[in-house]
Amino acid sequence: MKYIGAHVSAAGGLANAPARAAEIGATAFALFTKNQRQWRAAPLTPQVIDDFKIACEKYHFSAAQILPHDSYLINLGHPVSEALEKSRDAFLDEMQRCEQLGLTLLNFHPGSHLMQIAQEDCLARIAESINIALAQTEGVTAVIENTAGQGSNLGFEFEQLAAIIDGVEDKSRVGVCIDTCHAFAAGYDLRTPEACEKTFAEFGKIVGFQYLRGMHLNDAKSAFGSRVDRHHSLGEGNIGHDAFRWIMQDARFDGIPLILETINPDIWAEEIAWLKAQQIAEVMA
């Protein structure tokens, strides 16, 4: 079964996120558990935690259907020790918030070397950052998102994702989220079913589908291989509809959150309905 949704707002309280997801016909959702533009947030109160859990139950969202995202400020591969510690503390806080909310996944961008340390050293720092957080939490999987490779961001090659996973001690609590826009911008073609087969065969060989814990379904304004991260609505960008139809009709993408981060929230309900229809087309065939 496909879990399809979008990154919804938690404005006014975390308990509002499941309702907003249900309103657009989603069977999955992503959210920030705190203001993603701030390093620290007030601790979660028992009331906030209970309200969120009740709302998830009311709208039939299990932890497997929810893909929280951490703050964009965090850089788990930061070359400067003080800044690295600040990021590690913030990431641990994000993991602990997920644990308190009964969530089992935390999606994050791996990190950037800022042109100050070698790529290999940065990847090792990211893996060690994950190890530190996993050692102090239970039940939450760290889900590494592939990047477009913009600037000095790492995680744009499958080999880099595999290198991070290799450095994580508890392999049962590390995973990957593949963003289609990022992959396309990084040079992984998705424009045809044949291209999708080739790209995901490479993913399976280098990273492994056992680590795929979520996806971001985004078309791309940016050109193929441009290393520029610019999302677009499904079918409106340079990837086109075929990739998303192909994903909907492949059972390897069942049972994980498939999250829209496309640029027009007003049509998320339409995009979700279209994605669901592609899945139905497969069943009928």
Curated annotation (Swiss-Prot):
Positions contributing to Zn(2+) 1 binding: 69, 109, 145
One protein family per Pfam: AP_endonuc_2
Keywords: DNA damage, DNA repair, Endonuclease, Hydrolase, Metal-binding, Nuclease, Zinc
Molecular function (Gene Ontology), one example: zinc ion binding
Cofactor: Zn(2+)
SMART domains on file: AP2Ec
Highest taxon in the source lineage: Bacteria
Enzyme Commission number(s) from the entry: 3.1.21.2
Enzyme class: hydrolase
InterPro entries for this protein: AP_endonuc_2, AP_endonuc_F2_Zn_BS, Xyl_isomerase-like_sf, Xyl_isomerase-like_TIM-brl
Record field: catalytic activity: Endonucleolytic cleavage to 5'-phosphooligonucleotide end-products
GO BP terms: base-excision repair
Positions of Zn(2+) 3 binding: 182, 229, 231
Record family assignment: Belongs to the AP endonuclease 2 family.
Function (record text): Endonuclease IV plays a role in DNA repair. It cleaves phosphodiester bonds at apurinic or apyrimidinic (AP) sites, generating a 3'-hydroxyl group and a 5'-terminal sugar phosphate.
Protein name stated in the entry: Probable endonuclease 4
Lineage: Bacteria, Pseudomonadati, Pseudomonadota, Gammaproteobacteria, Enterobacterales
